[in-house]
């Protein structure tokens, strides 16, 4: 039975068991265990436990946004097909028609198989990369923080088919910085990146095709890392995207072994 909880005090043994198993540990927990432990303090996040025969077999943190009909599984800790089935039954009973996103451990066959049975759409496996310091390499390019004069050019260039559209980013500048690449008074690229957390991440990095491979991607990222101060920065890159991985490495990111993930989405 799935039920919402307000404390994890009784579940540390279960959490440690799941998170010590490389086949089932949740990627978001590995990135930052406060994705689990601070969930109770975060708006619109809910923590559920599944109990089977008196034993805990699943803990799930869900971000639920009713006005947008959107759910994200922030953390999912379970080895049990039964627990995942209970989770999906709960979602189907209460949130029919919602979009639900998952970031899963590629080795978690139990969850992956259930998502396949739900006709989930999967993206490619992602490589985790972390930056703690910017590259020492200098990029003599014009990189600026967003200002209103670039609003329309930024909106026009921005990727449209994502949750964090240009308009949403600009309405959340308490957590996002927007860096702009300028060439001869024209916008040629941008980077959306969070800055309000101990571990921040780029959300969208775009450089116009004719300006790619000139260092703009690295310059945008390097500037963001520099302004990130003592915080770390993480990103996920397609494991087969060797050129993209190289760009991030040149900007100051390191490949982190053993922490890959896969994004999946369903309509409930």
Located regions from the model:
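Short amphipathic alpha-helix that is part of the acyltransferase structural core
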Residues: 1-31, 126, 135-164
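Active-site rim helix/loop that mediates acceptor-substrate recognition in acyltransferases
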Residues: 24-47, 158-187
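Conserved donor-binding loop and adjoining core beta-sheet/short helix segment
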Residues: 29-87, 189-209
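Conserved acetyl-CoA-binding loop-helix of GNAT-fold acetyltransferases
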Residues: 80-93, 207, 213-227, 245-250
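Hydrophobic alpha-helical segments and helix pairs
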Residues: 84-136
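Conserved beta-strand-loop-alpha-helix junction that forms the acyl-donor binding cleft
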Residues: 101-112, 234-246, 263-267
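Conserved catalytic-core motifs of GNAT/GCN5-like acyltransferases
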Residues: 121-133, 236, 254-268
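Glycine/small-residue-rich hydrophobic helix-like segments
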Residues: 171-228
